[in-house]
Amino acid sequence: MDPNCSCVAGESCTCAGSCKCKQCRCASCKKSCCSCCPVGCAKCAQGCVCKGASDKCSCCA
């Protein structure tokens, strides 16, 4: 289970506008949740929902 949402890690779940899920995919927005990424990070823009500061982005590292 993801401690921040009611889903099993890696499974789909429904997320609100402010996505707190870290280990699951959000069915409602069809994207994985991650920190907000710096400008120019195409990978993050395509598959993530912002949930944190850009300097803590992990999906574009």
UniProtKB/Swiss-Prot annotation:
Q: Which SUPFAM superfamilies match?
A: Metallothionein
One BP term from GO = cellular response to zinc ion
Which InterPro entries is this protein grouped with?
Answer: Metalthion_dom_sf (IPR017854), Metalthion_dom_sf_vert (IPR023587), Metalthion_vert (IPR000006), Metalthion_vert_metal_BS (IPR018064)
Pfam families, alphabetized: Metallothio
Residue positions annotated to bind a divalent metal cation 3 are 15, 19, 24, 29
Ranges for region Alpha? 30-61
Answer whether the UniProt record assigns the keyword Metal-binding to this protein.
yes
The entry's a divalent metal cation 2-binding residues are 7, 13, 15, 26
Question: Region Beta: what ranges?
Answer: 1-29
Tell me if Metal-binding is a UniProt keyword of this record: yes
Residues that, per the record, bind a divalent metal cation 6: 37, 41, 44, 60
Q: PROSITE patterns of this UniProt entry?
A: METALLOTHIONEIN_VRT
Record-annotated residues binding a divalent metal cation 1? 5, 7, 21, 24
Q: Which UniProt keywords apply?
A: Metal-binding, Metal-thiolate cluster
Give me the Gene Ontology terms describing cellular component: cytoplasm; nucleus
Q: Which domain of life is it from?
A: Eukaryota
- Positions binding a divalent metal cation 4 in this chain are 33-34, 44, 48
Annotated a divalent metal cation 7 binding lies at 50, 57, 59-60
Q: Which residues bind a divalent metal cation 5?
A: 34, 36-37, 50
Q: Which GO terms describe its molecular function?
A: metal ion binding; zinc ion binding
Q: What does this protein do?
A: Metallothioneins have a high content of cysteine residues that bind various heavy metals; these proteins are transcriptionally regulated by both heavy metals and glucocorticoids.
Q: What is known of its domains?
A: Class I metallothioneins contain 2 metal-binding domains: four divalent ions are chelated within cluster A of the alpha domain and are coordinated via cysteinyl thiolate bridges to 11 cysteine ligands. Cluster B, the corresponding region within the beta domain, can ligate three divalent ions to 9 cysteines.
Describe the family membership recorded for this protein in Swiss-Prot or TrEMBL: Belongs to the metallothionein superfamily. Type 1 family.
This one is known as Metallothionein-1B
